[in-house]
Structures are given as C-alpha cells and as structure tokens.
Amino acid sequence: MSSSPPQHDLGHCDGDDFLARYTLHSRAEILFQLRALQKRKVLVNLDLSESRQIIVTSVLAVNEADNTVVLDSARGDALNNELMSGKGAEFVAQLDGVSISFSIGAVSLCEYEKLPALRIPVPTSLIRLQRREHFRVPLPIANPVKCIVPSPWEESKEQITTHLVDIGCGGVALTDIGARLGTESGRLLRGCRLLLPETDVVVTTLEIRNSAQIRLQNGSFQTRLGCKFVDLPNDMAAHLQRFVMNIERARRNRL
C-alpha cells in the first residue's frame, strides 16, 4: 500500500512560491514521471476532496498520442461515481522517496485489457517534491512491522497493535483497524513502541497529522493515520535512520 499523502511544511515562505519551485511544466518530463510510475508498478493514492476517502490504484498505461493516463478502477461504484462527478481529487504517489502529485481533471470509465479502468488527462503540471523529513520507504505487507500504541483514552489500559505502512525519519503511516486511536489532527499518541526488526525498539510520541479511510480490495475499510515523530531522542533517531537506510538499500538492490 501506499503511503499517506505527504504534509508539506512550508516554513516561513509563501506556499505558492514554495511549490512553484518544484512544479514541472515540461510535457516530456511529466510523461517520464508517469511512465516511471507505470513501469515500477507504484501504488497511487487518489484523494477524494469531498468524502476524504482515498482510492488506492496504479498507472496501467500512459498514452501520449491521445494525452491520457489509464488507472486501475476503484473497487465500488460509489467511489468511481464520486471520481467522475468532477468534485475533485488529488493524485499522490511516492517514487524513490520523491512525492509526485497533481490535481486530477475529468475522469471517465474505460476498459484496459478487458477489465474496467479509469481514464484521466495527462496533467499540464506536476509537483515533484523531496525533503528529508518527507522521505518515506514502504514496508513489506507480508511481514508487517508492528507499532504498539497505549490507548489514548484515560479509562482504558489497552495496548493497541497497529501495522506500519511506511516509515521515514520524520514520521510513519500506520493502519488502525476499528479506529481505536481516533483521527483528530494534533492528537498525541504517547509511549508508542516501534518493533523494528534487527534493531532496538524505538519508543516515541506520535502526533496524528492526517487520516483517511482506505477501501481494501475485499470491500472492507481501514483507517490510515499519517503521524510525525515528536521529540524523538537522538539514540532512537539513529536506530530509525539506520533502519530506513537498510530498507531502502535492500529495495534498490532488488530493482
């Protein structure tokens, strides 16, 4: 699965000026990025503006001649209908630690290799942004990395087991089945234990920055939380950085 959408910390500069420096307008460069996503079979998030749901999809084809991109269709008519309603959606993906995003234009249904698919126009501009704190590496689904979170509710002593979707030096995305941790932006989750393989347990506070309901292929939903580290101790940060580097090195060696 793909990671949650990156939160761009604009600091003291104007957001429009900041993003303008990372916006591609060259058609050739935009097509190159889209084809890289297709070739690498990168999972893509389509963030629906109105319902705040996320569709997980992938790029199936890039057609330069008719100026279209073909995406895997959503699982469910309601989500497909919302996409085609013109209410707005954002295309977000991560390629080698670089965030690639653009606003989606008109969406239509089509067929690709005799299966239902979605067709969108090739964007006229595309944001390509990498900053150290936004660099995330996806974690394997087959052997999920656990994060144990004490319940944020005072009356509960429950230890909630979650699975990490991706991880970086600035934060993590995790799945919360049953929405037991809440989704309020700014909520602090204290005493979280990241059970990283082949390294010491990382203990930290996580701050919820964003949340989304993810529709799985079997039709069920799960809550995905994008969180940042708060006051991560230096020794824990060192363990974390080594882990991220090892995961990324192993991923590159498999390419």
Swiss-Prot record:
Coiled-coil stretches: none
Location of the protein in the cell: Bacterial flagellum basal body
One GO-annotated biological process of the protein: bacterial-type flagellum-dependent cell motility
Residues covered by the PilZ domain: 130-245
Keyword terms of this UniProt record: Bacterial flagellum, c-di-GMP, Nucleotide-binding
GO cellular component, one term: bacterial-type flagellum basal body
One Pfam assignment: PilZN
Chief place of localization: other
SS bonds (residue pairs): none
MF GO annotations: cyclic-di-GMP binding
Subunit structure: Monomer. Interacts with the flagellar basal bodies.
Function according to Swiss-Prot or TrEMBL: Acts as a flagellar brake, regulating swimming and swarming in a bis-(3'-5') cyclic diguanylic acid (c-di-GMP)-dependent manner. Binds 1 c-di-GMP dimer per subunit. Increasing levels of c-di-GMP lead to decreased motility.
Family named by the database record: Belongs to the YcgR family.
Record's protein name: Flagellar brake protein YcgR
Organism: Thiobacillus denitrificans (strain ATCC 25259 / T1)
Lineage: Bacteria, Pseudomonadati, Pseudomonadota, Betaproteobacteria, Nitrosomonadales
Gene of this entry: ycgR
